[in-house]
Amino acid sequence: MHFAYILILLILTPRVDSSWWYIGALGARVICDNIPGLVNKQRQLCQKHPDIMQAIGEGAKEWIRECQHQFRHHRWNCSTLDRDHTVFGRVMLRSSRETAFVYAISYAGVVYAITRACSQGELKSCNCDPKKRGRSKDERGEFDWGGCSDHIDFGIKFPKDFVDAKEKRLKDARALMNLHNNRCGRMAVKRFMNLECKCHGVSGSCTLRTCWRAMSDFRKTGDFLRRRYNGAIQVTMNQDGSGFAVANQNFRKATKKDLVYFENSPDYCVMDKTAGSLGTAGRVCDKVSRGTDGCEVMCCGRGYDTTRVTRITKCECKFHWCCAVRCKECEETVDVHTCKAPKRAEWLDQT
């Protein structure tokens, strides 16, 4: 009975897409009425805070680049679709671990972008963290708050109102999954906040310190969430629909720090429009690697084509005082391996 309840719940659950991702495609000229799929609260916040929307748009480009970096050696490589308001296409309709990662990294990207814009004085509604004033102390002793501490609390609060608005309104199984992974994303940024200090005193003796709180490079957040993706936990809804139960009883329960997902991923080997898979035909692979970037894994056993190409690289670089590095340009001939396309009959079965 419990299994049947979960199955019906998942089948009938409407799919939730994050239409606000499209803000990144619109760029600086964000027109709220042109973003499809926003709920009323999101549209109102969009109209009220055009400067924050611009920051979110710039941030979207950054987190998409980070997603593509993290999955550059993966069959699914975080590809985006032009002129598609879902940005990633039908692949996001499946409640898979890839979807879990995208929700987490996108939310982290919004938090990061808004917090940075605050510190740079680009937003009317916030600036540096007002709580970081006066004196404080750490394990090295006392210090004075100074400089401009990143206002991470504001960077988290606005996305909770804007990004989470659609999921909070729907309150279905997929929405709960999205909210959980959103939380993982925003807490990942906060996890890597650093205390940075400048020493004052004779010859830098550090008798006095001025310190401020600053976000780490976004790559740290991306690396952390990729590790969470690797350890993501498959879940089902619990019987009262208020939370999650682990799908496999041999695995530990999901915590607030874990990414969660409902459905297994497709293999992403061949183009499959219904699953949103672009396939791996034509993808560059590593002939000798046994990892996910290796030709055997990337090409799904179909084999690969080898093309000899000549490219220009910098070589014989030397440092010249002061202060430049000068390089020669050298020709280099290398073999590039790309995955073969599937046989036509195999491809037709997936379309």
Curated annotation (Swiss-Prot):
Lipid tethering residues (O-palmitoleoyl serine): 203
Keywords associated with the record: Developmental protein, Disulfide bond, Extracellular matrix, Glycoprotein, Lipoprotein, Secreted, Signal, Wnt signaling pathway
GO cellular component annotations of the record: extracellular space
GO biological processes: animal organ development; canonical Wnt signaling pathway; cell fate commitment; neuron differentiation
Any GO molecular function: cytokine activity
Changes after translation: Palmitoleoylation is required for efficient binding to frizzled receptors. Depalmitoleoylation leads to Wnt signaling pathway inhibition.
Alphabetized Pfam families for the sequence: wnt
Residues with glycosylation annotation: 77
SMART domains named in the record: WNT1
Disulfides per UniProt: 67-78, 118-126, 128-148, 197-211, 199-206, 269-300, 285-295, 299-339, 315-330, 317-327, 322-323
CDD domains cross-referenced by the UniProt entry: Wnt_Wnt2b (cd19346)
Subcellular location: Secreted, Extracellular space, Extracellular matrix; Secreted
InterPro entries, alphabetized: Wnt (IPR005817), Wnt2 (IPR009140), Wnt_C (IPR043158), Wnt_CS (IPR018161)
Major place of residence: secreted
Tissue: Expressed maternally in both vegetal and animal blastomeres with enrichment in the animal hemisphere. Expressed zygotically near the prosencephalic-mesencephalic boundary of the developing brain in neurula and tailbud stages, and also in non-brain areas at tadpole stages.
PROSITE patterns: WNT1
Secretion signal, residue range per the UniProt entry: 1-16
PANTHER family to which the protein is assigned, alphabetical: PROTEIN WNT-2B (PTHR12027:SF93), WNT RELATED (PTHR12027)
UniProt function note: Ligand for members of the frizzled family of seven transmembrane receptors. Functions in the canonical Wnt/beta-catenin signaling pathway.
Family recorded in the similarity comment: Belongs to the Wnt family.
Record's protein name: Protein Wnt-2b-A
Natural source organism: Xenopus laevis (African clawed frog)
